[in-house]
Structure formats: structure tokens, C-alpha cells
From Swiss-Prot:
Maltosyltransferase that uses maltose 1-phosphate (M1P) as the sugar donor to elongate linear or branched alpha-(1->4)-glucans. Is involved in a branched alpha-glucan biosynthetic pathway from trehalose, together with TreS, Mak and GlgB. The gene is glgE. GO terms for molecular function: hexosyltransferase activity; hydrolase activity, hydrolyzing O-glycosyl compounds. It comes from Chlorobaculum tepidum (strain ATCC 49652 / DSM 12025 / NBRC 103806 / TLS). Homodimer. This is Alpha-1,4-glucan:maltose-1-phosphate maltosyltransferase. It comes from the Bacteria. It holds the Pfam family Alpha-amylase.
Length: 670
């Protein structure tokens, strides 16, 4: 039976109109595109919701945040707190991965309104006999709603209040016992329920904090020039684990086409021994659900995944929905591709560039439903082999509706699945992919290099609505991108960009071993590696002098030991001055704090990889409720040294040839 091809729509609550519902609920936050898309959190996070809630006049109101797992009937309720100016707030701890729903409701509390009015009249010395009898009527209605013991308690209070203006009646009216019993039996018949049920996507913990390492399996044979295998890669796992990575990302592991195969450095004609680009997927040996024969068997791949998991590492697979001309789909499903007037299949183009070894899939095919099913089956196949994380190649060049349908339906079956969107494209496209189901997003971090650029970009990612649904994953390099910042070959520059990625974002990755070996030679005139591993098998010397493997391992240990660095959004940039009133443009500092406030990390990085830089740093003591003159200590987790700081302004200095960064753990007096 074919699946239903329906995209989600905002869930609106069409309750019959009743003019007696006086409470107004407005500006619920977070809410993405009117409830069209889910907010995202990670299991164990707290989900905080705010809303404007008010009514006419001065009556007291009560509000609740409601939440439940999608598909459940009953709601859990959390009382909301008034935080000023008719703004209300509440939170709850999210559970296991899956989809949740939440909304808000509020109602007039006639008992609280009456009780407050009674107290004011008593304070003014007025007669309250009639008011007490009015209160008895309100409490009697509460008794009718109450259950078991509370019903009897409230009937008792009705008797006391009905007497009128006696001291006993007044005492009963203001008693905590009556208040507690009435709060347990609220009058919700005329409650206003927000007109939308909003969605909350809960992801596995690695969605919030992960450390990625990309490598090409074919380059890891112990025999020079020989094609590496999954068995060879198992031997790499301890080294990768020691560096502190918990996600291994493999470029496509499928059979590679022969037709129009690319040669070394993307040459149009391949030599007899050139392995081709692994993104030219498909040959007589199979397509997207097959492994390249020279890498090994499917059983050996599964063994690799299992061994990685045993060492605390998840395996992420690259999914590239494109085909070589030799892919079985070209013959089996020609309707999924575009054909030119001369009868040849349309290859990929970005005029004037031509990519004749790759065929794009036609998402306007008349057979689009079967196409969608087949593409989704690729994910499901690899999930069946133990893969839970996918990096998707160029998703912005495929139909957005497909991603929303496919990722949503996959997540319904396998809620722990993660998807990284490799989309270096326009901001609105990147945002839509994140809204439509992608767990992580590649970013513009690679091209943000000055202090102003970095701070402006991080502010956009963490202080706007983007923070509610788009999780950045920072990569200082990829097999496709060697930014000019790294082309100078400075070891310090590689450490600088690494530390920035690892401490600005809780999710980051590197393409290795090119990065830890400070590989920096570009193809002339391009942001690409010379002799790119995309087109050839490399033989790496992992112990090459000048590598930064120990620095990577150290910073990753710091990340794992400090919860403040395991989140992205709580970041405060600090002022660093070269002289009074003059901002330092080469020293950048930022503070992160764990959700419970117990772990505070201050990172200071020099952006100058050649010269020593120093300046006066202002630590934001007021953020932590401390006076500007507070004395405290900071421990540099890189050097192991501890410094005593006196007040908010303190001097910092970095020599890039020693270490271009401080990662301070801030210890404020208890």
C-alpha cells in the first residue's frame, strides 16, 4: 500500500464560539510560522513557553501550559507564572526523542478575584457580610467540581461562609486550606484554549552536542596505493576516539560509475587507476543500497558500525541523491531523469561548468510518488544496517516538500535519527531545510573570519528565532572547501579556526586527517585542495611533524568535561579593549554558561596567527548577579594555570606561537 503524501499543516482548534470566554491569549513563543513547523529541543532540555494572557477589567486569571506526546489524548499541565506586563511563562523537561504537542490555556479565577476583593474591603473597614455569602456560592460551585475529600472540605467551608459576617466566616474565607482546595478544583468551563496546537520535535542528545570527524575509507589501507576497506577502518577507531570524536562521517560508500569518470584534480579524463569521485554513485555493482566492492562486504560494513558504537562513536553516512550514468536506476527508472532532444540523459550543469559523471534526479517526474518512496527507502535501508545519522549532500537542490515528507515519516518510525543538511546556500533556503526536518545545518562559519563577522553571525544564530529550529554545525574545512584563511599554512591559524568552531558551536566537525595535519596547499586560484582526496586515494602520515592532534584531543576533552560548551545559544560576547574606549579587533572573547549555572566558561581567542596580542577584558559580572568589584579566579583549562582576577576588568595576552586561545573556567565565590 502506498503511503499518504500529505505535508503537515498547523493544527487549529475550532471550538464553538462562546462570548463568556473572556481571557485573551496572544503572542505565544516559541511558535514557528504560525505552528506550521516544530520547535526543536534535545531530550533532557527544558522547554520554556511564554504568552501574553489577559482579560478585560481587573479579574484574576490563571494560565497553564499543556503538553503531551503526539498521538496521546491526555494533556499534562504546568501552571504558568506572571512575569510582568501580562506576560506569562512556564517550562517542562522534555522526554525521549519523538514529537510532542503543546498549547496554552487560561481562565478567569472568580474565587481568587473574590478573595482579593474581600481582603481589600476588610482592610478598608467595610461590612463584608454579603460578600461572604457571595463567596459561599462560589465555593459551593467548587465543591460540585471537586472530588472525594476536597468536596467534603469545600462543603464545610460553604457552611462557614453562609453565616455571614462572623469572625469565623472571615477566618475561613482567608484560610490557606480553602485556597488550596479551590485551586485543586479550578473552574475551567469558560477557559480560553489557544487556537493552535504547536509542535515540539525532541531529538537525541547528539543533536545538541556532537563532535564529527570525516574521512575517506578508501585511503586507509596499510599498503600504499591499495584501496582501503572497512576492516582497515576499524583499526582507525581507537585513534579517532582518543581525539575525542563521537561521530564518524563517511563520504558515499557506494559503487562508483565508470562513464565520464573524473580523474585526479577533477580532470575530465580518468586514468586507468583513478578511483573516481565517490559522489558519482552507481555502477553495475549496484546503487544507493550497495557498498563499493573494494571497501568490503555489507557484513563488514555492519561490523564497522558495531565496533564504532562499542567505542562510543556513531557512524554517519553521506546520502547524495544523484547518479552516475551507470546507476541501475537509469535503466530501471528512466522516467526519474531528464532526457534531452538527442535522446541522451541530462547530466548536472552549473553553466558554464559541466559535471558529466553525475545525473541529477528529476523531482518533476510524472512518477514522483514512486521516486519519493524509493529515495526514502535508501534511508530506511541504512537504518536497518545500524546507521542513525545522515549527512545529506546538497539538499537545497531537491524538492523541499520531499524532505519534509521523507524526514518526517522516517522520524515517526525512528525518532532518534539525525540529518545534517550540507547546504551552503542562501539563508532562506537553509532556514527552510531546518524547519522541514533537518537536525543540523552547515553554516557560513567557514566564511566568517573577522571579529565583527563572527560576532554578528553568532548573534543571528543564537538571538533570533533561528535558535528555535536551526542547529548550526561548524566546519572549518571540508573535502570541497579549503578557505584562504587556511591556505597560508600557519599551524596557529588551524588551531584558531578549530578552537572557534569547537567553542562557539556545541556541534562541529573537521575533515581529517587533512585538518589535524594542517594540509593547506590549494588548487591554484580556488578554495579547494590541490590533489583532492575526492578524486584519488591518499596515503597519510598521521604523525607528520606540525600536526595539531594533541590540541584537538585536549579541546575535545574540555568540551566533554564542561556542560557550558555543550550548548550553543547561551553565549555572551565580552568587551576587550586595546586601550580605553578602543575595541580590540584581534582578540575575541565570549562566555558560555551551563543551564544550571554551575559551569561558566570564558573563551578568549586571538585572530592574529603571527603576533602576540594583549588587551583589557571586561567580564560581565552583572550577568551572574555579582558586583563589578568581585574578586574571583579563572582556571585556564589549556595551560592548567589559575589566575586571580580583581573586578570586571583584567588583562589577557596571547602568543599564537605558544597557544592562540585561553579556555577559562570561571570560579565565582559561593
Amino acid at each position: 500500500m502506498k503511503p499518504e503524501f500529505v505535508l503537515p499543516a498547523p493544527i487549529r482548534l475550532d471550538r464553538p464560539f462562546d462570548g463568556r470566554r473572556r481571557v485573551v491569549i496572544d503572542r505565544v513563543f516559541p511558535e514557528i510560522d504560525g505552528g506550521r513547523f516544530p520547535v526543536k529541543r534535545v531530550e533532557g532540555d527544558r522547554m520554556t513557553v511564554e504568552a501574553d494572557i489577559f482579560t478585560d477589567g481587573a479579574d484574576t486569571i490563571v494560565a497553564e501550559l499543556l503538553y503531551r506526546r503526539k498521538g496521546e489524548a491526555a494533556w499534562s499541565a504546568v501552571p504558568m507564572t506572571h512575569i510582568g506586563n501580562d506576560r506569562w511563562k512556564a517550562s517542562f523537561e522534555v522526554g525521549a526523542p519523538g514529537m510532542c504537542e503543546y498549547t496554552v490555556q487560561g481562565w478567569v479565577d472568580h474565587f481568587e478575584t473574590w478573595r482579593k476583593g474581600l481582603q481589600k474591603k476588610l482592610d478598608a473597614g467595610q461590612d463584608v457580610s454579603l460578600d461572604l455569602r457571595i463567596g459561599a456560592t462560589i465555593v459551593e460551585l467548587g465543591a460540585a467540581r471537586a472530588k472525594d475529600e476536597d468536596a467534603g472540605t469545600l462543603h464545610h467551608y460553604v457552611g462557614l461562609l453562609s453565616v455571614g459576617g462572623s469572625d469565623a466566616a472571615v477566618e475561613a474565607a482567608l484560610s490557606e486550606g480553602l485556597l488550596a482546595a479551590m485551586r485543586r478544583s479550578p473552574e475551567k468551563a469558560m477557559a480560553t484554549l489557544y487556537d493552535k496546537i504547536l509542535l515540539l520535535q525532541i531529538d537525541q542528545k547528539k543533536a545538541g552536542f556532537s563532535t564529527w570527524y570525516e574521512f575517506f575509507p578508501r585511503s586507509w589501507s596499510e599498503e600504499p596505493g591499495k584501496h582501503g576497506t572497512f576492516r582497515d577502518c576499524i583499526k582507525l577507531l581507537p585513534r579517532i576516539a582518543r581525539m575525542g570524536f563521537d561521530v564518524i562521517y563517511l563520504p558515499p560508500i557506494h559503487p562508483i560509475g565508470l562513464t565520464k569518470r573524473k580523474g585526479k584534480n577533477n580532470a575530465l579524463v580518468a586514468g586507468p587507476d583513478d578511483p573516481g569521485s565517490c559522489w558519482a554513485i552507481g555502477s553495475a555493482d549496484g546503487g544507493h543500497t550497495s557498498v563499493h566492492p573494494e571497501l568490503g562486504t555489507m557484513e563488514e560494513f555492519e561490523a564497522f558500525v558495531q565496533e564504532a558504537e562499542a567505542q562510543g562513536i556513531s557512524v554517519a553516512l553521506d546520502i547524495a541523491f544523484q547518479c552516475s550514468p551507470d546507476h541501475p536506476w537509469v535503466k530501471e527508472h528512466p522516467q526519474w531523469f531528464r532526457w534531452r532532444p538527442d535522446g541522451t540523459v541530462q547530466f548536472a550543469e552549473n553553466p558554464p561548468k559541466r559535471y558529466e559523471d553525475i545525473l541529477p534526479i528529476d523531482f518533476e517526474s510524472e512518477d514522483w510518488q514512486n521516486l519519493w518512496i524509493a529515495l526514502r527507502e535508501v534511508f530506511l535501508f541504512w537504518i536497518g544496517k545500524g546507521v542513525k545519522i545522515f549527512r545529506v549532500d546538497n539538499p537545497h537542490t531537491k524538492a523541499f516538500g520531499f524532505w519534509e515528507w521523507a524526514l518526517g515519516s522516517i522520524r515517526e518510525q525512528y525518532p532518534e535519527t539525525m540529518f545534517l543538511a550540507e547546504a551552503f546556500t542562501r539563508p532562506k533556503l537553509m532556514a527552510r531545510l531546518a524547519k522541514g526536518g533537518y537536525t543540523h545545518s552547515y553554516t557560513y562559519f567557514t566564511w566568517r573570519n573577522t571579529k565583527h563577522e563572527l560576532q554578528e553571525y553568532l548573534t543571528e544564530l543564537t538571538q533570533t528565532e533561528l535558535r528555535e529550529y536551526m542547529r548550526p554545525n561548524f566546519w572549518p574545512n571540508t573535502p570541497d572547501i579549503l578557505h584562504e584563511e587556511l591556505q597560508g599554512g600557519s599551524r596557529a591559524r588551524f588551531i584558531i579556526r578549530f578552537v572557534l568552531a569547537a567553542t562557539l558551536s556545541s556541534n562541529y566537525g573537521i575533515y581529517g586527517p587533512a585538518y589535524e595535519l594542517c594540509e593547506h596547499v590549494p588548487y591554484p586560484g580556488k578554495e579547494e585542495y590541490l590533489d583532492s582526496e575526492k578524486y584519488e586515494i591518499k596515503q597519510w602520515d598521521l604523525d607528520r611533524p606540525g600536526n595539531i592532534r594533541s590540541e584537538i584531543a585536549m579541546v575535545n576533552r574540555i568540551r566533554h568535561n564542561n556542560p557550558a560548551l555543550q550548548q550553543t545559544s547561551d553565549i555572551t560576547f565580552v568587551k576587550i579593549e586595546v586601550s580605553q574606549g578602543q575595541e580590540h579587533d584581534q582578540l575575541m572573547g565570549y562566555v558560555k554558561c551551563s543551564p544550571d549555572g554551575a559551569n561558566i566558561i570564558l573563551t578568549v581567542v586571538t585572530l592574529d596567527d603571527r603576533n602576540t596580542q594583549g588587551g583589557w577584558l571586561r567580564f560581565p559580572l552583572e550577568k551572574f548577579g555579582r558586583p563589578h568589584t568581585e574578586r574571583f579566579t579563572v582556571e585556564d583549562l589549556i595551560s592548567g594555570r589559575t589566575f586571580e582576577w580583581n573586578g570586571e576588568w583584567n588583562y589577557v595576552e596571547l602568543n599564537p606561537h605558544q597557544m592562540p586561545a585561553h579556555i577559562f573556567r570561571v570560579n565565582l565565590p559561593s
